């Protein structure tokens, strides 16, 4: 062929030149030099439109369709056309729901191999996409782009440094985006991947390099699912019906809390926080410990009848210590410790007196006029009467019932009626919080247990909260209603059932309910079920597969305030 031949003739000559002879025109001399160095005949063809050099006629035919717009491969189902036959073949998998690529670790299936490769990064700690501003790494390019859009270091980029070097920034962007290109030896993939029990601590990341082949991935999955593999500790148990977080959890307190006196230092620090907060906090602690003692087989009565180590006689204390040395431990009882019933009544009276009177060392602390002279069991040998901490009838005036009288002369009798308040300490919690917010002495707060089915006052079950929760479907639902009185007249009150507190001011109640979006945050918007706490609410959403919806209800209607 002559040197003045057309370009088409040159292309045909190049394509048909299977012996690898040099082209006389010299236009592709550089490409032929590449063929000579690599030892392969690539049959290079140059595009006239954009100058792209294609490796073969088939590559050139596919590339030229991008300029002409030709799409010869068309789907006969939906009519979508493609430039290559392989794209049409992959498109047919959409209509047939065929997913030939499956993850060897989980049940994920996909239609494309590159999607499977991207999914495998979830099971490993490989993060090949790195931010160019702050060097944070991500597993997907989309996550990295979203981060770069709002990266705080755009104006002042931070140059990351590879591990093992100080003050040596990356030289190019390719190394920054590829963590596998960091300097240093790569760990060997022949060693088995560590199981969860071999990790240093809970939450530690696995090694950054995944196993090399599928067999090692399957072996890792088998080790993780083995019965002997260690797992994370279970979440803390939340007992329903007790005060605490959302009114349904109770802190673990030592069994001697009921016998602890009213501390002077704690009262001084609490007075600075506000008024009757120390007294209310002490009552909460005593009531919470009373619930724990009531759940034991012996009940609260046995726990109150057991004297402390400091109040036991020297003979009983020495005999108990000698029994411990010999390996035999005897439990304290009224007969073994030789404590008289009158001493028990005096101890109980002192405990109840500490609930309503301050410590003797705090006489200089200013108190309201009605609390300057509380009852003291040390000054008076036989006090007239004392109010019981029964939240079913908790009033601040001097009108009491004869059944709720405890004296130091009569023995302490724990009847079924007196045990009824232990499972419903949440009502006492709301009452105590109302006492804290109220500074007037002529306001009476009463708590009534109402039966919703009969709409009348009924007796409360004396079982423990754990027993009541087991038979919740068989028993009737009990509701606590709070009434606030001032000078004999009933006041309007607003109650937040989520936080277990009442408000005497409507504006304060509206501001507080704005935190909960004027709705109950523990009620499912899909089925209407109300959960006891946040943990049960999240478990309900997961197990029932509800779609989260943002529903904002209207605020509650205001009642007429006198």
From Swiss-Prot:
| Entry keyword annotation includes Nucleus | yes
The superkingdom listed in its UniProt entry is: Eukaryota
Where it sits in the cell: the answer is:
Nucleus
Chain intervals annotated as zinc finger (C2H2-type): 45-67, 73-95, 101-123, 129-152, 494-516, 522-546
Q: Name one GO cellular component term.
A: nucleus
Record bears the keyword Signal: no
Which Pfam families does UniProt cross-reference here?
Answer: zf-C2H2
**Major localization listed first in the record, in broad terms:** nucleus
Query: Where do Polar residues bias regions lie?
Result: 327-336, 456-471
Entry keywords, A to Z: DNA-binding, Metal-binding, Nucleus, Repeat, Transcription, Transcription regulation, Zinc, Zinc-finger
Where does the record place the region Disordered?
178-210, 293-342, 361-404, 451-473
Which segments show compositional bias classed as Low complexity?
A: 307-326
Write out the tissue specificity statement of the associated record.
Expression is strongest in the anterior Fol cells of the oikoplastic epithelium.
The record ties this protein, via SMART domains, to:
ZnF_C2H2
> What's a single GO MF annotation on this record?
zinc ion binding
User: Which ranges are annotated Basic and acidic residues under compositional bias?
Assistant: 369-383
- Comment field on protein domains: N-terminal zinc-finger domains are similar to the Ikaros clan but may not have the same binding specificity. Key residues involved in binding to the consensus Ikaros target site (5'-GGGA-3'), found in the promoter regions have diverged.
The text of the family note is:
Belongs to the Ikaros C2H2-type zinc-finger protein family.
- This protein's name: Ikaros family zinc finger protein
Give the source species: Oikopleura dioica
């Amino acid at each position: 062929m002559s040197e003045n031949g057309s370009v088409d003739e040159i292309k045909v000559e190049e394509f048909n030149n299977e012996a690898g002879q040099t082209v006389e025109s010299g236009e592709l001399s550089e490409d032929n030099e590449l063929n000579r160095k690599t030892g392969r005949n690539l049959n290079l063809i140059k595009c006239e439109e954009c100058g792209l050099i294609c490796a073969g006629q088939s590559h050139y035919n596919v590339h030229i369709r991008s300029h002409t717009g030709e799409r010869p491969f068309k789907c006969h189902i939906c009519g979508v056309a493609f430039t290559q036959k392989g794209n049409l073949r992959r498109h047919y998998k959409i209509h047939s729901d065929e997913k030939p690529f499956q993850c060897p670790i989980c049940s994920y299936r996909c239609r494309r191999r590159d999607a499977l490769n991207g999914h495998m990064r979830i099971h490993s700690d490989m993060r090949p996409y790195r931010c160019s501003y702050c060097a944070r790494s991500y597993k997907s390019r989309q996550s990295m782009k979203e981060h770069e859009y709002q990266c705080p270091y755009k104006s002042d980029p931070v140059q990351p440094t590879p591990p093992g070097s100080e003050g040596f920034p990356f030289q190019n962007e390719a190394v920054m985006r590829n963590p596998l290109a960091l300097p240093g030896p790569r760990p060997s993939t022949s060693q088995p991947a560590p199981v969860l029990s071999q990790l240093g601590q809970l939450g530690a990341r696995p090694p950054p390099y995944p196993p090399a082949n599928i067999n090692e991935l399957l072996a890792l999955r088998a080790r993780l699912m083995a019965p002997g593999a260690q797992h994370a500790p279970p979440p803390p148990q939340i007992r329903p019906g007790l005060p605490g977080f959302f009114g349904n959890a109770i802190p673990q307190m030592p069994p001697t809390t009921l016998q602890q006196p009213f501390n002077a230092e704690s009262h001084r620090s609490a007075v600075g926080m506000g008024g009757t907060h120390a007294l209310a906090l002490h009552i909460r602690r005593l009531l919470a410990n009373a619930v724990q003692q009531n759940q034991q087989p012996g009940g609260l009565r046995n726990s109150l009848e057991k004297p402390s180590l400091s109040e036991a006689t020297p003979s009983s204390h020495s005999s108990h210590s000698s029994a411990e040395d010999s390996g035999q431990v005897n439990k304290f009882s009224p007969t073994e410790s030789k404590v008289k019933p009158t001493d028990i009544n005096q101890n109980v009276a002192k405990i109840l007196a500490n609930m309503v009177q301050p410590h003797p060392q705090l006489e200089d602390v200013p108190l309201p006029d009605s609390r300057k002279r509380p009852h003291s069991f040390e000054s008076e040998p036989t006090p007239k009467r004392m109010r019981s901490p029964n939240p079913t009838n908790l009033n601040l005036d001097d009108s009491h019932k004869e059944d709720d009288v405890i004296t130091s002369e009569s023995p302490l009798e724990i009847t079924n009626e007196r045990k009824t308040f232990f499972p419903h300490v949440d009502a006492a919690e709301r009452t105590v919080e109302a006492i804290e917010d109220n500074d007037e002495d002529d306001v009476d707060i009463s708590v009534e247990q109402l039966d919703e089915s009969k709409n009348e006052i009924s007796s409360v079950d004396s079982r423990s909260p754990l027993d009541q929760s087991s038979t919740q479907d068989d028993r009737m639902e009990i509701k606590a209603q709070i009434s606030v009185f001032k000078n004999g007249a009933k006041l309007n009150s607003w109650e937040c059932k989520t936080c277990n507190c009442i408000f005497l001011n409507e504006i304060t109640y509206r501001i507080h309910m704005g935190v909960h979006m004027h709705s109950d945050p523990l009620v499912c918007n899909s089925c209407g079920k109300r959960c006891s706490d946040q943990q049960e609410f999240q478990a309900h959403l997961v197990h029932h597969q509800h779609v989260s919806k943002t529903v904002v209800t209207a605020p509650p209607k205001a009642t007429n305030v006198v």
